[in-house]
């Protein structure tokens, strides 16, 4: 590598404008970073952070789930909790939609995903570390809470099933043949069990920083190589269409990218970290900041995948794209470290997903979790259900794809419930509720339209699906306005 190449790699925006390449990508990176400092700060001030208010980590400390931890550790745990396969595999699939994927990753992260993650964590913190179903029940009603408990636990089981096979396959490709995929599936499941039942600071608090380092190395390494390679990525002024067969941009792209822009799964993870925060002011770097970093990871993988598709075509699975990019771009050692980062992301989402499911069931059943036997009692049926889905995905040729699609839709639907619950909270607290109302309306339209049009849904034609999505969104807006006007009447 020449001195000029190194300088260009360290000055990405200089090279973008110098060579008139990757300008859209570079601008998108800058906007994401600015979004944290500008809009993230506004959201924090709007919420009304109280640095003197005691947090659940202090008032409910139990040494297991409610426990004070250093802010940097909480950030790393939150980042790894939410950064599963979504910002990597989802971004790779989303790259087939062209520069539209950049727009959704950037603006979806800043105005929807990061707001969703931050406020779900802070509302939980203000409610003594309440889980997502409890928050939804308080602000949307007890009937909705019951639906949310079932829906959330289902999503957690899907997360575990989805986030086992792919990392097991990647590890098997790096180890002796006698250590096959099934061996690593058992190892990962065993790790899930240990991480789910032990106190959060014993395994998760110690292992996650190492995993986080690998994931950060992967993202930074690929970013540097992108600016060295200078691929001719599509620019926004060339149009937002795509030459690949990926389906209609709306709603398919908004479901495919999933965690790279907004994810309901994150709202199940934010309360876990809300139970460990020492001060409310740490909420912005932990919740909003982790989502912005995930958006950056998704943007990097979307750009890398675009460069890959231009050179090799799209007839590859997301796992194959990851394996090729890591090994070809970063060399043997760098590729191994990068793949370890990719492996760490889904595994660390899977264990905290199971932990979330355990805590949600414990809250519902009012079962204390200080004894290991009671933790095991709740974990057993969850692991059995996940194992059943995993077996289905292995035995069925399209099993993983089917489970992934249902996971993606359930994931985004969960974000809709979360955004509506937070909107109600903001109205009751007399704060700017439009910051969540607008994303709530948009995502309501997305998930409704998707389930109408998708192969795993009702398989309706596009026009009818758009009409139904629009009608459902207007109905949601009407019900919200009616409820809000009812508050004024009571007052």
Which residues does each PLM region occupy?
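Membrane-interface "cap" regions at the ends of multi-pass membrane proteins
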Residues: 19, 31-88, 252, 282
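Extracellular loop-to-transmembrane helix junctions
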Residues: 22-40, 94-124, 133, 334-335, ...
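Membrane-interface loop-to-helix entry segments
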Residues: 26, 30-50, 141, 151, ...
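Helix-loop-helix module between adjacent transmembrane segments
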Residues: 32, 36, 112-128, 132-197, ...
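Flexible loop linkers connecting adjacent transmembrane helices
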Residues: 41-67, 90-93, 107, 115-144, ...
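Hydrophobic, membrane-embedded alpha-helices of multi-pass small-molecule transporters
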Residues: 69-86, 223-231, 239-301, 340-349
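Hydrophobic alpha-helical segments and their helix-loop junctions in multi-pass secondary transporters
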Residues: 160-184, 195-196, 215-241, 425-433, ...
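Extracellular/periplasmic helix-exit of transmembrane alpha-helices
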Residues: 226-236, 288-324, 394-395
């Amino acid at each position: 590598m020449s001195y000029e190449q190194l300088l260009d790699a360290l000055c990405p925006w200089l090279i973008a404008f110098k060579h008139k390449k990757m300008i859209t990508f570079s601008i998108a990176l800058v906007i994401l970073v600015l979004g944290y400092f500008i809009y993230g700060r506004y959201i924090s001030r709007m919420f009304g952070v109280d640095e003197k208010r005691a947090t659940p980590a202090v008032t409910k400390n139990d040494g297991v789930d409610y426990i004070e931890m250093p802010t940097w550790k909480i950030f790393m745990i939150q980042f790894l909790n939410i950064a599963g396969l979504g910002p990597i595999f989802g971004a790779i699939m989303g790259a087939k939609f062209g520069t539209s994927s950049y727009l959704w990753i950037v603006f979806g992260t800043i105005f929807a995903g990061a707001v969703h993650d931050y406020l779900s964590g802070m509302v939980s913190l203000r409610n003594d570390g309440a889980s997502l179903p409890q928050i939804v029940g308080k602000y949307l009603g007890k009937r909705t809470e019951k639906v949310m408990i079932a829906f959330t636990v289902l999503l957690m089981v899907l997360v575990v099933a989805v986030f086992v096979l792919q990392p097991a396959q990647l590890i098997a490709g790096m180890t002796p043949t006698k250590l096959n995929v099934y061996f690593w599936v058992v190892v990962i499941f065993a790790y899930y069990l240990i991480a789910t039942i032990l106190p959060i600071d014993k395994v998760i608090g110690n292992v996650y920083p190492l995993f986080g380092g690998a994931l950060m190395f992967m993202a930074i390494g690929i970013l540097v190589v992108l600016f060295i390679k200078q691929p001719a990525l599509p620019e926004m002024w060339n149009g937002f269409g795509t030459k690949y067969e990926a389906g209609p941009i709306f709603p398919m792209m908004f479901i495919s990218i999933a965690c790279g822009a907004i994810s309901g799964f994150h709202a199940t993870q934010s309360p876990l970290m809300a139970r460990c925060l020492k001060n409310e002011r740490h909420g912005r770097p932990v919740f909003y900041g982790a989502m912005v970093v995930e958006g950056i990871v998704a943007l990097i993988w979307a750009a890398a995948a675009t460069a890959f598709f231009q050179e090799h075509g799209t007839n590859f699975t997301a796992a194959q794209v990851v394996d090729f990019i890591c090994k070809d771009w970063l060399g043997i050692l760098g590729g191994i470290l990068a793949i370890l980062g990719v492996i760490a992301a889904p595994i660390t989402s899977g264990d905290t997903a199971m932990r979330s499911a355990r805590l949600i069931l414990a809250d519902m059943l009012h079962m204390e979790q200080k004894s290991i036997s009671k933790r095991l009692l709740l974990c057993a049926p969850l692991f059995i259900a996940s194992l059943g889905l995993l077996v289905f995905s292995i035995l069925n040729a399209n099993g993983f794809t089917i489970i992934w699609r249902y996971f993606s839709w359930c994931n985004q639907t969960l974000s809709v419930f979360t955004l509506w619950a937070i909107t109600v909270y903001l109205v009751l607290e007399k704060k700017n509720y439009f910051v969540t109302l607008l994303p709530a309306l948009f995502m309501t339209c997305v998930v409704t339209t998707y389930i109408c049009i998708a192969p795993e849904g009702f398989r309706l034609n596009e026009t009818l699906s758009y009409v139904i999505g629009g009608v459902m969104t207007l109905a949601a807006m009407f019900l919200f306005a009616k409820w809000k006007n009812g508050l004024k009447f009571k007052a």
